[in-house]
């Protein structure tokens, strides 16, 4: 198959007018559009997709979301994962690393086993698990259930990782809690440690980073604000070039001005767009649940009954659009932050995150308004 005349988003983060050859479900070559490539392609006797006037981008990679279309990662069933992977694929998210919640110990073990045993049925590829809780701070729990919060427990984590067959890619911790630094030392190099749901001050966050934490979960949310005399976690993450930070750009969690300021402070190469979506995403307003707690959804806003924001009701493609349209971030940067950056962060960049020879042919064709025209996974068009 050859995708011709596309405006291709290339691995170097720029656009090129070109043709992309797909063979056996993988990208075979990416060719700049010339008369020579046109003649070579025409003689290949392959299926031709004319993408004139369209933008071709890698399939998006969401490394932090909980559910969509009525299903949640913590439902712990293959059927829920089928729903999640199908919906995410339909909105251009072709690789997913869904997040767990702070649920009961045995229940979390069951959720991990379900994901580890999951058999791929098409749709988005399940490439990892983001373990958001239970190793967090009670004072910054957000929409997590307080009764299930616990101290970092390396043996329990290993039990969960075994049940998941090694699928846990990120684990969230509050570094100020007892045992957190020792836990980072124990798991360093085997999983990405993310600072999350934390009341840590600057020095404590710096210590965690020095011991191996390299990621910040939904920056600004469930952590102390940036203050000019107390920079906290945000300042510590900013000061460490090896740290990457998630942003929920759904129009609810972070003001567009702060999105712009964050890109200016950190640089796009360190930003990761996430959706943090919950099961109401893709459905109508109403009453739902997240981590066993009741959630009310009105438009893009999802809240607990006390008003606490409870994830989002927006998918990653819409978050990327918001980043461009409302926050004014260049399209090239927004795409990178929703594709290459998250893929690199969880160690799947050899398979996903860019349109490059040898990688899975997961890609999206968009029009100039960033509306989806078609989605391809493993070189096959899926129903949107």
Residue spans of the language-model regions?
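C-terminal cap of metal-dependent C-N hydrolases
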Residues: 6, 344, 354-384
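Divalent metal-dependent hydrolysis catalytic cores, especially in the metallo-beta-lactamase
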Residues: 66, 82-111, 124-137, 164-176, ...
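Histidine-rich, glycine-flanked metal-binding segment
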Residues: 1-2, 8-57
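His/Asp/Glu-enriched, well-ordered alpha-helical/loop segment
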Residues: 236-245, 251, 263-275, 280-366
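Conserved, mostly hydrophobic/aromatic
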Residues: 53, 131, 187, 216, ...
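Active-site core of metal-dependent hydrolases
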Residues: 162-283
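Active-site gating loops and adjacent loop-to-helix segments of metal-dependent hydrolytic enzymes
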Residues: 86-97, 137-165, 207-219, 230-244, ...
């Amino acid at each position: 198959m050859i995708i011709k005349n596309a405006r291709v988003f290339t691995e170097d983060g720029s656009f090129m007018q070109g043709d992309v050859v797909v063979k056996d479900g993988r990208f075979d070559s990416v060719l700049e559009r010339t008369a020579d490539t046109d003649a070579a392609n025409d003689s290949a006797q392959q299926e031709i997709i004319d993408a004139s006037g369209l933008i071709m981008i890698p399939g998006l990679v969401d490394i932090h979301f909980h559910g969509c279309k009525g299903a949640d990662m913590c439902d712990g069933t293959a059927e829920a994962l089928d729903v999640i992977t199908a919906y995410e694929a339909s909105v251009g998210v072709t690789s997913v690393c869904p997040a767990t919640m702070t649920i009961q110990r045995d229940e979390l073990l069951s959720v991990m086993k379900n994901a580890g045993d999951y058999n791929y049925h098409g749709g988005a590829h399940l490439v990892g698990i983001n373990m958001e809780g239970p190793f967090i701070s009670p004072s910054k729990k957000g929409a997590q259930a307080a009764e299930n919060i616990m101290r970092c427990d390396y043996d329990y984590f290993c039990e969960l990782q075994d049940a998941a067959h090694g699928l846990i890619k990120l684990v969230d911790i509050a570094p100020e809690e007892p045992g957190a630094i020792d836990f980072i030392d124990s798991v360093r190099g085997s999983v990405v440690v993310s600072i999350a749901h934390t009341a840590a001050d600057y020095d404590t966050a710096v210590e965690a980073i020095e011991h191996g934490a390299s990621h910040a979960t939904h920056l600004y949310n469930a952590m102390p604000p940036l203050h000019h005399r107390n920079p906290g976690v945000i300042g510590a993450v900013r000061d460490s070039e090896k740290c990457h930070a998630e942003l929920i750009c759904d129009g609810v969690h972070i003001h567009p001005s702060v999105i712009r300021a964050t890109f200016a402070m950190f640089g796009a190469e360190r930003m990761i767009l996430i959706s943090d979506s919950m099961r109401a995403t893709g459905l109508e307003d109403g009453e739902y649940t997240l981590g066993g707690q009741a959630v009310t959804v009105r438009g893009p806003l999802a809240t607990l009954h006390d008003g606490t924001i409870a994830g989002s009701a927006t998918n990653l493609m819409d978050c990327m659009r918001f980043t461009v349209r409302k926050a004014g971030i260049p399209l090239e940067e927004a795409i990178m932050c929703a594709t290459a950056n998250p893929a690199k962060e969880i160690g799947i960049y050899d398979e996903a995150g860019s349109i490059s020879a040898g990688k899975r042919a997961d890609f999206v064709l968009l029009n100039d308004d960033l509306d989806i025209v078609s989605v391809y996974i493993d070189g096959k068009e899926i129903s949107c």
